[in-house]
Structure formats: structure tokens, C-alpha cells
Amino acid sequence: MALALSFSQEEGDGLFLCNWAKYLKLDEELEKIEARSDLDDLSDLRNLIQREPDFLDARVSLGMHCYRNDDFGNAKAVAETGLAVANELIPARFKGTIAWLRVENRAFLRLLSLAALSNARLGRHGEALAHIMRSMKYNPDDELGLRGVLGSELLRTGEDATAKRC
């Protein structure tokens, strides 16, 4: 049984959909992996991603592990690879929101945040700003708090006038 990640639009809002029964089984497996004290051995997490590439939550877990260990290059790579999976599902013409209130959207929004923060730590401020702006467009309520780094990234990219309005 595959996870079968897809994207749906309802009244202008976007929603990632999947086989919920499969998701719950994968989430349980992910929780067991994350609970282990030997998480420095990431092979089980990498194997889960390889086996279920649409399971974005596993990518968030791996990326956050890299980020917490100051491995910003790998955190960025993991986030952007996960975003590539999700982006293939979002229609180019989609202009709506992807709300945090929908649990199904949270992994995608976390990947956007991780990509923004990793790029910022790597000094790739233009890329960081692009991810922040995209996240704010999709999720204007900004539950992940990227608005807090928006001004700094605007200044770092030379957009002083815009930064002053933030």
C-alpha cells in the first residue's frame, strides 16, 4: 500500500492528501526511529525516506537532525529534495494558501522553513528570502515564525526600504 501523496484545491486553499492509514503506520515507524538514543545512526531514517519518498515527515526529521547538528548543507539538501517532491504536485497556476491548520500541510511548510533557515545559515540570503516569501504567501498566519527573520534577510539582500516596512 503506497502513501500516494497528492495535492487538492478546495475553495482556493491547497491541501496535501495521502492514504491516511498508510500515513499513520509510517508516522508510528518514524516516532520509533526518533525515540531511539542512537539517532546519530541515520540509516533507518534514510531507509524510510528511500522506501517512502512521498513521506515528507521523514524528510523533515532528517533535515532537522542535520540542522540541529550544524550540518546546514545537508539540512538544505534534504529540505529542497523534499520540496521538489511536493512542488511536483502543486499546480503552477495555484495561487491559494496552504494552511498550517491542516495537519496534512505541515510537513511541506516545515520543509519550506527548514530550507529558508538552512540557506540563511549558509549565507545564501537570496535563496533564504525566496523560501520565506513563498512560505508567507502560502501560509500568511506564519505559525512557524519566519516573519521574525524576514527583516534580517531583506537587509542582507540589500532590500533596505522593504526591510524598514517589516
Residue ranges and their predicted role:
Residues A92-S113, L144-T157:
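TPR/TPR-like alpha-solenoid helical repeat scaffolds
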Residues M1-I98, A115, N119-D141:
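N-terminal alpha-helical interaction modules that lie
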Residues L24-E31, S61, R110, L114, ...:
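"A position-specific structural signal for the A-helix of alpha-solenoid helical repeats
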Residues L129-K164:
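Hydrophobic, aromatic-enriched interface-forming segments
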